[in-house]
């Protein structure tokens, strides 16, 4: 067996080696290369298909030889560099390709261009074989690949980087390609043979009969192949942008001249006393107006032209002035323009610059770059705009670029090498003659690198050890800390250069400033040298001048330059203004450097800024095609401007300064641009597929499965399945008579509701289909060239024809016909209707303008013509007094009293809709005729039937009866005549009775015997004279049969009624006496009915006339009563208990809510026990109902609830369970801990010394409170924290910790914790939340390296306090793995108190929390906190209590908004409290309700307010603090009132956030109203919510706008207003909106709604890295601000307090544990700290060693003897603290980001784990 396995293992390893060998991989890749087809295959196939005979064989051989030779050259070029350069450069391949393609095209078509003959046989026959060889060779070198792509060819190039034996790999890959090529050609040959031998093809009649066509095809085959070749070449060229016509970078110089100067501020020390000098010619400018205007090398100024002002007097085209680059320094402009004085050496300068400009011309525009730009300026094709971090467009290119660089002292290939640096290096190598071409060996480089690193490490280590030794001697820390070096003018005066100009400072203080020195301080000899070195780009200097050393400044000149730094800037101590000197130079010295703009704009932004000053010339981003349609032009001044948005129709309105109101109309076509940048390659975008004629959104074929209806299956399978299932259920369902009339009626109502819903659904689907067709028609018109102009002209012609020709002619014809028919003509009525018809010109989307005014650019953009009150030609006019139609369909038809004109002159409901059916002139005539004919037919039928019956009667009656009957009739006639003589109305004893059906009664739906019993009652005819007896006999028989069925039905109903009342007696409470009374009443009515029905037959037989009618009436009335009474009673019976139950539940809930409100602040509440009480109380509500408990979650809780009711129990049997301090497998930790704290069992507390027993009373109190599951909100928890109280507890804890038993439940291993979690035994929050949070944020490896021994007691990452998390019994438990900065969704508002969610308000008083008094909401009543905390369930919570609103509620009117808004806003506010550094504090001082009245005692210290995202990493306090919180600080000169902040709100918004990029074009925008300012403030700030209005309101407003645009143009709009209000188009409630409403009032009225935005956060590597670093940077900021609030430590004050470092980070536990020690490395500056750690990690000899001198020195002596004082301190913890203090100082994560790119050539944070190899070596314990 061993032998077999050994042999098998060897075979497997052998096979693996063979598969992974270079030869096999090369063969495989070469074989794959075969599948990439190109145009060269066309020549090869043509030689095989066309050529025949001896010459054809030669051509086949030559074609194959050329093809293989070309491919071999391509493979060799991979390895051989010169050949690769020749074939790989675009210049050479284009020089080869273009002439050869032209030659080849004319070679095949030069002679017989219009003939059908073979051209290759007759001309230059001797060269034909050579030409075939060249064709195949050269086209193989062109490297054009069509199918499937060129990726397969490049696989060989890619694998070359991994392969060691490159030549063998190239050879094997070529052999593999050759094998694939041979197989392919064999396959082609087989196909050709099969085609020749196939009889079906040869026997085709069409082919045989057209032999001439076949021969013609063979002769023209050469031309066909040339056409195919041309198409493939065009296809290949189409995939790359044209090098000449692509959009290049702007190179035009736009000079910007300013008349103003800004005073430059300078920072001085308190001892500084500057000299006073006059300032000449400077005017003060508002500081806020230039904020962020030219940040970061003036990013949006594409040119960097510098200007010089001449004499300070006049400005001409040739006179310019210089200005510094402006940077953000504490929210103030640091510079503005800066003039030079002097009048010397201007002529020399002019001569020198003229000479230099001539030399620069040829280099600036080389000939090659005209065709090819290998720097790829047009490379990026996507622009991601980020308001917080605006990067260059160039940033979006790929980060992978291969080049060699030195890393760790060795030459290595870097795949993230900057391409610009590589290009620059190549330029230097070509141009510089002194460039060293000698290369050192790798060993020499490595040794030199190691030596330098060792020297640096020794120097830094010695400096660090010296500082620690001095500190150990007892010196002050401030004297030992390493200071930053600053540039100083004089030691005595201590006048420093401002930080923005100081070259020795780093970070945000550094600004990029271009200094230009005055010729007055430089002698005449060196003037040219300085101009060369400082004004001309140094890159060009290096490239042009080889002897560059002669231009280096000498030492004396350097001294003069430094002297100039202080002479040029002179300080006035009072005004803090910089006085500037100026010189004059008459010539422009500028260099236009092509650079990418930092902000690109699209069409819409360009149109918005057209009327602003300094607007952008052209847009850079190609966005969706849009047309701007002006709908209204206001000639008057517009005091206030509003903005309307229509999301459905994609219309946005735009207000210009001219008063134009415009709609932006977007087409429904696919957006092929997709925000592409001009000049970029579209082919590099993701491929898209077009599936429909008009597809609004393009998408990749990858997402075909996510489309609603798949491409090949047009029907919806889910709908078909539903229909089939319903039909199947209906077939199998048995028809049963329902036991209850109410259930029957409910089913009927459900069915009717279902039918109505289906009808509504079908109607909506039909509307959607019609809308889709309409949009397609509109887009078709819009897409065809000149279609809009043709359509517009046709519409105008149709409008004129209709109004002035067609309708008047119809009116004339109608009235002439009326006169011919002797009717009164209706000229006035028709003319009135004709005058009422209005033809309103509309925009393409249907916005009404006026009758006379045409839309702007209507011939190109389109036009619609809307007909208001369309004329209807009527044969006659009705009287005005008529009833309104109650039919909703007719009402709807009346409402839509307008239409749109179509091209064919017809009417449509909507633009491009289907034409509606027009009412004909003869339709009412035909209707009237039909009615009359129907009436005549009815009357005639009745008379005929009566006559027939009379005739039958007289035939069958005997003579005596006839005589008696005739006498009676004569007698009646006499009586009638008497009555008629007396001129009275005749008494109609009998008359016609109308036919009716029972189904037409009102109770049709409620009748249980509907469609099953009586369908029709017979027709009874009441005659005026006599009735036929035979007819009555027939009716009698029918009536008898019907009587029997009625009797049976009544009996059946009574039985059902009895049965139903028997059931109801059991359920109805006995005090409901009305039911018994009704039942007796029903019984009595039933008996009467039965008596009547028994005698019914006899009564009918005796009296055939009156009693028959009477019985029918009685029968109908009683039957309907019997049917209705049970229905009403049963319905009442069913509804009353339901109401009673609902009322009971409501009262119960109200009572419970009241209890909950009273118990809000009782911290001793046990949550799960209270829930059990509620469940038990609820179970008593109905004894018959059964309650099923979840045994896994409720069994222990219920048992221990019963146990808790006993005062003291001697739980002897459970003693071992309670005394066991490990992880219990069957007893929940929280229950055990609860019983231990409450003392429910009697046994002695054992004083055990556990490893984690060091715990203060604060944490025990929180644990004991929180484990009772009283779930407060995070905000309420933060209010409970008191730092002083906790410190006092700490102080007491040092004495009391001996006898404290903490119930060691909190130090659990993660794996056990995971098993316990699955068994519903959840461990503490301090472990669980810690683990998930840190695993997600810092990466698993980083977390383990920090806290790999003890996850609980980390001295660095312990946060303010830790709490115990328990598994809830009734709520869903969620582990919060949230994203870091996803503010709207990622921050949890749940029932868990996480560590990082707590903010210590006393410690962090610099933060201004979002006060609820700022945002005014109408709250209806107080509600418990628990009603709005998210418990994980999907309960709708309408009200909430937030930050003490129960105690103080604003007296404001209630808002009519829905309360769905509030929970979302709660998330936002909690997010603000948790991460308040994201939102600028200035934001909170804007008064939202429009008033600016603020109490005077509140003033703001406007101190260095910076952009919040920049200020994260700042080293100084940048916040605004209230005056009453800053009593210990002096009042500075910068203090301003809050009113001034609000007055300057517009400028702050625009300059502080928007950072006007395009030459300050947005800077001068002025707001016209408070509303506009507030809207801008809200929408452009960092708050994560947006304003919107309701959808229904949205459509209403758009409709109103359309009506307003029409009304404003009409002279007498009264009639249109009234009709619009009647039709519902004009809403009066929207008209009541005032234009001066503030944002708060708009929200109160429900017009505007605030809702949180749905942010889509892409957590890529850079984002995670930034967030990881950001955590420590925030703590660093907190540490600097909270220095004055720092409390004293309570340990060894003599030795330890002296060594507390000021810059100590606050990331450690704020409880001041005894192991919370300072980091000794903080003695060094951050730069040297980083350098020391990196150099220690670069220990080349032993990678796992670290410098033991630093560890074993005396720098840890102070910490060691403090720790030894503790009695029960763990020994291992001492070593662990030393290790952590040494390995992980506070700046460690900052180092990770800095080192990451340079060590591992990556900026992707997913590779963080690799860094631990160097940074975190494991220490062996000694």
Swiss-Prot record:
Lineage, opening ranks: Eukaryota, Viridiplantae, Streptophyta, Embryophyta, Tracheophyta
Family: Belongs to the TIC214 family.
Keywords noted in UniProt: Chloroplast, Coiled coil, Membrane, Plastid, Plastid inner membrane, Protein transport, Transmembrane, Transmembrane helix, Transport
Protein name in the entry: Protein TIC 214
More about this protein: There is a partial copy of the N-terminus (positions 1-601) of ycf1 in the inverted repeat (ABO36758).
Main location class: plastid
Assembly mode: Part of the Tic complex.
Residues forming coiled coils: 1031-1102
Sequence segments annotated as region (Disordered): 250-310, 742-765
Short name of any one Pfam family annotated for the protein: Ycf1
Function, in words: Involved in protein precursor import into chloroplasts. May be part of an intermediate translocation complex acting as a protein-conducting channel at the inner envelope.
Membrane topology category: Multi-pass membrane protein
Membrane-spanning segments: 18-38, 67-87, 90-110, 127-147, 175-195, 224-244
Keyword DNA-binding tagged: no
Subcellular location: Plastid, Chloroplast inner membrane
Residue ranges, compositional bias (Basic and acidic residues): 293-310, 745-765
GO CC annotations, alphabetized: chloroplast inner membrane
Native source organism of the sequence: Populus trichocarpa (Western balsam poplar)
Ranges of Acidic residues composition bias in the record: 256-268
Coiled coil recorded as keyword: yes
GO biological process: protein transport
């Amino acid at each position: 067996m061993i032998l077999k396995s050994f042999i098998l293992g060897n075979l497997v390893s052998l096979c693996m080696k063979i598969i992974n060998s270079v030869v096999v991989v090369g063969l495989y890749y070469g074989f794959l290369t075969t599948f990439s087809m190109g145009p060269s295959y066309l020549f090869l196939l043509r030689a095989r298909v066309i050529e025949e005979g001896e010459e054809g064989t030669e051509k086949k051989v030559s074609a194959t030889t050329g093809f293989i030779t070309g491919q071999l050259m391509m493979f060799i070029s991979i390895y051989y560099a010169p050949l690769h350069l020749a074939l790989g450069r675009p210049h050479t391949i284009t020089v080869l390709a273009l002439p050869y393609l032209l030659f080849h095209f004319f070679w095949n078509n030069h002679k017989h261009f219009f003939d059908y003959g073979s051209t290759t046989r007759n001309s230059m026959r001797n060269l034909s074989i050579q030409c075939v060889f060249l064709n195949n060779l050269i086209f193989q070198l062109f490297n054009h690949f069509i199918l499937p792509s060129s990726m397969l060819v490049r696989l060989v190039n890619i694998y070359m980087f991994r392969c060691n034996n490159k030549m063998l790999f190239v050879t094997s890959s070529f052999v593999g390609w050759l094998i694939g090529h041979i197989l392919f050609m064999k396959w082609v040959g087989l196909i050709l043979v099969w085609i020749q031998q196939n009889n079906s093809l040869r026997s085709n009649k069409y082919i045989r009969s057209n032999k001439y066509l076949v021969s013609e095809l063979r002769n023209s085959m050469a031309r066909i192949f040339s056409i195919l070749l041309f198409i493939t070449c065009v296809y290949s060229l189409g995939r790359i942008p044209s090098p000449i016509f692509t959009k290049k970078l702007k190179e035009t110089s736009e000079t910007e001249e300013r008349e103003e100067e800004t005073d430059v501020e300078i920072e001085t020390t308190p001892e500084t006393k500057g000299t006073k000098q006059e300032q000449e010619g400077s005017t003060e400018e508002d500081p806020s107006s230039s904020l962020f205007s030219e940040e970061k090398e003036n990013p949006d100024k594409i040119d960097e032209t510098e200007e010089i002002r001449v004499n300070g007097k006049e400005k001409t085209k040739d006179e310019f002035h210089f200005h510094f680059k402006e940077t953000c320094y504490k929210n103030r402009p640091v510079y503005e323009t800066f003039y030079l004085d002097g009048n010397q050496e201007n002529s020399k300068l002019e001569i020198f610059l003229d000479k230099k400009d001539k030399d620069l011309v040829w280099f600036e525009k080389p000939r090659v770059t005209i065709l090819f730009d290998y720097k790829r300026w047009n490379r990026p094709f996507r622009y991601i705009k980020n308001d917080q971090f605006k990067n260059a467009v160039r940033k979006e290119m790929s980060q992978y670029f291969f080049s060699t660089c030195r890393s760790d002292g060795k030459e290595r290939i870097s795949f993230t090498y900057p391409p610009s640096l590589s290009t620059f290096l190549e330029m230097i190598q070509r141009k510089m003659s002194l460039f060293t071409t000698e290369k050192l060996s790798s060993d020499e480089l490595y040794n030199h690198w190691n030596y330098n690193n060792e020297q640096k490490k020794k120097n830094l280590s010695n400096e660090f050890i010296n500082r620690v030794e001095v500190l150990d001697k007892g010196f002050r820390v401030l004297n030992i800390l390493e200071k930053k070096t600053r540039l100083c003018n004089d030691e005595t005066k201590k006048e420093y250069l401002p930080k923005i100009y100081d070259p020795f400072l780093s970070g945000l203080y550094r600004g990029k400033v271009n200094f230009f020195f005055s010729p007055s301080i430089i002698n005449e000899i060196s003037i040219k040298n300085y101009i060369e070195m400082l004004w001309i780009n140094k890159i060009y200097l290096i490239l042009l001048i080889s002897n560059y050393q002669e231009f280096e400044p000498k030492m004396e000149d350097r001294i003069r330059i430094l002297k100039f730094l202080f002479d040029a800037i002179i300080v006035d101590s009072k005004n803090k203004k910089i006085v500037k000197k100026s010189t004059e130079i008459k010539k422009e010295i500028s260099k236009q450097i092509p650079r990418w703009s930092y902000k690109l704009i699209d069409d819409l932004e360009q149109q918005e800024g057209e009327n602003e000053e300094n607007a952008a010339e052209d847009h850079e981003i190609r966005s969706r095609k849009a047309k701007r349609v002006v709908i209204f032009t206001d000639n008057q001044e517009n005091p206030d401007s509003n903005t309307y948005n229509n999301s459905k129709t994609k219309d946005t309105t735009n207000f210009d300064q001219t008063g134009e109101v415009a709609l932006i109309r977007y087409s429904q076509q696919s957006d092929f641009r997709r925000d592409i940048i001009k000049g970029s390659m579209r082919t590099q975008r993701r491929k898209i597929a077009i599936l429909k004629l008009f597809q609004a959104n393009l998408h990749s074929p990858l997402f075909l499965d996510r489309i609603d209806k798949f491409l090949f299956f047009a029907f919806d399978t889910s709908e078909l399945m539903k229909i089939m299932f319903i039909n199947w259920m209906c077939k199998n369902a048995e028809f049963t008579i329902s036991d209850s009339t109410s259930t029957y009626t409910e089913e009927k109502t459900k069915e009717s509701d279902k039918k109505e819903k289906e009808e509504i659904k079908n109607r909506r689907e039909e509307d959607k289909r019609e809308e889709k067709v309409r949009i397609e028609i509109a887009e078709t018109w819009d897409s065809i060239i000149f279609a809009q102009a043709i359509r517009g002209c046709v519409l105008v012609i149709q409008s004129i024809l209709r109004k002035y020709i067609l309708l008047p002619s119809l009116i004339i014809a109608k009235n002439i016909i009326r006169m011919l028919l002797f009717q009164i003509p209706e000229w006035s009525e028709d003319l009135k209707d004709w005058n009422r018809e209005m033809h309103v010109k509309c925009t393409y989307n249907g916005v009404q303008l006026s009758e006379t005014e045409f839309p702007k650019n209507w011939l190109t953009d389109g036009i619609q013509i809307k007909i208001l009150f369309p004329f209807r030609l009527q044969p006659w006019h009705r009287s005005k007094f008529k009833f309104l139609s109650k039919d909703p369909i007719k009402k709807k038809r009346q409402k839509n009293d307008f239409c749109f004109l179509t091209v064919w002159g017809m009417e449509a409901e909507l633009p491009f809709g289907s034409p509606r059916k027009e009412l004909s002139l003869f339709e009412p005539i035909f209707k009237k005729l039909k009615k009359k004919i129907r009436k005549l037919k009815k009357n005639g039928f009745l008379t005929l039937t009566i006559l027939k019956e009379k005739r039958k009667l007289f035939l069958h009656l005997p003579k005596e009866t006839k005589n008696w009957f005739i006498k009676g009739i004569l007698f009646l006639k006499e009586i009638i005549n008497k009555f008629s003589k007396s001129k009275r109305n005749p008494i109609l004893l009998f008359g016609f009775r109308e036919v009716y059906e029972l189904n037409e009664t009102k109770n049709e739906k409620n009748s249980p015997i509907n469609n099953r019993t009586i369908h029709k009652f017979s027709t009874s005819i009441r005659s005026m004279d006599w009735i036929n007896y035979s007819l009555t006999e027939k009716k009698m028989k029918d009536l008898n049969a019907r009587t029997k069925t009625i009797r049976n039905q009544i009996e059946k109903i009574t039985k059902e009624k009895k049965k139903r009342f028997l059931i109801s007696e059991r359920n109805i409470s006995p005090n409901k006496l009305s039911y018994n009374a009704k039942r007796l009443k029903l019984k009595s009515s039933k008996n009467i009915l039965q008596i009547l029905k028994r005698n019914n037959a006899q009564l009918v037989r005796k009296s055939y006339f009156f009693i028959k009618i009477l019985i029918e009436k009685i029968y109908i009335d009683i039957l309907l009563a019997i049917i209705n009474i049970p229905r009403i009673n049963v319905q009442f019976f069913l509804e009353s208990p339901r109401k009673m139950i609902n009322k009971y539940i409501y009262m119960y809930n109200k009572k419970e809510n009241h209890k909950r409100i009273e118990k809000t602040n009782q911290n001793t509440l046990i949550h799960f026990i209270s829930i059990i009480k509620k469940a038990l109380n609820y179970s008593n509500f109905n004894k018959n109902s059964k309650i099923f408990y979840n045994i896994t979650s409720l069994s222990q809780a219920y048992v221990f609830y019963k146990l808790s009711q006993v005062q003291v129990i001697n739980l002897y049997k459970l003693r071992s369970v309670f005394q066991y301090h490990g992880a219990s497998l069957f007893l929940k930790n929280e229950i055990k801990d609860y019983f231990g704290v409450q003392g429910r069992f009697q046994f002695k507390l054992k004083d055990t010394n556990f490893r984690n027993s060091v715990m203060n009373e604060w944490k025990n109190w929180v644990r004991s409170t929180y484990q009772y599951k009283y779930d407060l909100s995070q905000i309420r928890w933060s209010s409970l924290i008191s730092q002083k109280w906790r410190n006092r507890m700490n102080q007491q804890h040092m004495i009391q910790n001996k006898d404290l038993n903490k119930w060691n439940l909190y130090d659990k291993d993660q794996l056990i914790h995971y098993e316990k979690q699955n068994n519903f035994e959840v461990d503490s929050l301090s472990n669980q939340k810690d683990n998930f949070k840190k695993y997600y944020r810092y990466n698993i490896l980083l977390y383990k390296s920090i806290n790999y021994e003890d996850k609980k007691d980390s001295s660095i990452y312990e946060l303010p306090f830790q709490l115990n998390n328990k598994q809830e019994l009734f709520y869903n438990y969620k582990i919060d793995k949230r994203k870091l900065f996803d503010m709207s969704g990622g921050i949890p508002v749940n029932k868990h108190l996480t560590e990082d969610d707590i903010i210590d308000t006393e410690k962090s008083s610099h933060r201004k929390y979002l006060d609820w008094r700022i945002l005014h909401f109408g709250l209806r009543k107080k509600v418990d906190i628990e009603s709005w905390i998210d418990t994980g369930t999907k309960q709708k919570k309408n009200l909430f209590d937030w930050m003490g609103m129960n105690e103080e509620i604003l007296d404001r009117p209630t808002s009519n908004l829905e309360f769905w808004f509030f929970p979302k806003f709660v998330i936002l506010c909690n997010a603000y409290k948790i991460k308040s550094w994201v939102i600028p504090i200035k934001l909170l001082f804007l008064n939202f309700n429009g008033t600016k009245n603020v109490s005077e005692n509140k003033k703001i210290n406007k101190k260095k307010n910076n952009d919040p995202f920049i200020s994260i990493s700042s080293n100084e306090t940048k916040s605004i603090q209230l005056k009453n919180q800053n009593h210990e600080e002096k009042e500075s000169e910068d203090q301003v009132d809050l009113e001034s902040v609000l007055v300057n709100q517009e400028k702050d918004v625009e300059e502080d956030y928007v950072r006007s990029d395009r030459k300050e074009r947005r800077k001068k925008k002025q707001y016209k109203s408070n509303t506009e300012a507030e809207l801008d403030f809200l929408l452009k700030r960092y708050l994560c919510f947006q304003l919107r209005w309701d959808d229904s309101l949205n459509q209403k407003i758009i409709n109103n706008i359309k009506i307003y645009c029409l009304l404003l143009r009409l002279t007498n709009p009264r009639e249109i207003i009234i009709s619009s209000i009647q039709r519902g188009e004009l809403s009066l409630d929207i008209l009541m909106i005032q234009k001066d409403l503030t944002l708060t009032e708009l929200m109160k009225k429900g017009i505007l709604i605030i809702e949180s935005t749905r942010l889509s956060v892409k957590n890529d590597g850079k984002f995670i890295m930034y967030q990881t670093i950001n955590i420590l940077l925030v703590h660093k900021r907190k540490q600097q601000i909270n220095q004055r609030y720092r409390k004293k430590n309570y340990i060894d004050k003599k030795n330890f307090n002296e060594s507390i470092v000021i810059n100590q980070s606050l990331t450690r536990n704020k409880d001041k544990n005894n192991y919370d020690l300072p980091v000794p490395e903080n003695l060094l500056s951050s730069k040297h700290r980083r350098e020391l750690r990196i150099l220690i990690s670069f220990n080349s000899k032993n990678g796992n060693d670290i410098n033991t001198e630093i560890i074993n020195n005396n720098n840890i002596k102070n910490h060691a003897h403090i720790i030894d004082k503790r009695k029960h301190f763990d020994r291992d913890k001492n070593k662990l603290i030393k290790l952590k203090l040494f390995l992980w100082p506070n700046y460690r994560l900052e180092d990770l980001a800095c080192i990451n790119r340079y060590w591992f050539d990556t900026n992707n944070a997913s590779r963080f784990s690799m860094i631990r190899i160097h940074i975190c070596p494991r220490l062996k314990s000694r």
